Amino acid sequence: DQARAWFTKMEHGDEEALDIWKWFVDISLKEYKGTYALLGMEFDHYLGESFYRDKTADVVKRLQDANLLEESQGAQIVNLEEYDMPPCLIMKKDGSSIYATRDLAAIFYRKQRWNFDKCLYVTGQEQKLHFAQVFKVVELLGNDWAKDSLVHIPYGLVSLEGAKLSTRSGNIIYAEDIL
């Protein structure tokens, strides 16, 4: 509950929450860049999920204008039953955005900014449904380019002695140790 409250504060522009968030972003980005360097990778832009938090209102407006949003238990969803998928949650009942909302904002930002031919999402296979839902919502908004341009590349998990790795449980292997 405390984490949700802080996230809501951040989404509503609370200065203390944003300062704490920025501190975490800076530390995380420094560590990510170190890992990327070990892999021989570098990026021109580092725009994390939180970069898109102020762009979610536009996503909600697009969905409202297209009559795609429905209320469900106080939350806002896009019904995807017709496509054999559960609903795509867009806004929680407290008005906060979620991953899908920010991923939609990221897609529209990236398409407008870079006019990509392909946008690849390389994530764990457990996010397969999430990206299928998000990509379908982009299509439902009349963006035919989404069918061929948005690609999810799922990967498996590294396990330790047959158990799933989890930072919360302390069962972890650091990428730097493997590399």
Regions found by a protein language model. Name each.
Residues D1-L179:
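NTP-dependent nucleotidyl-transfer catalytic core
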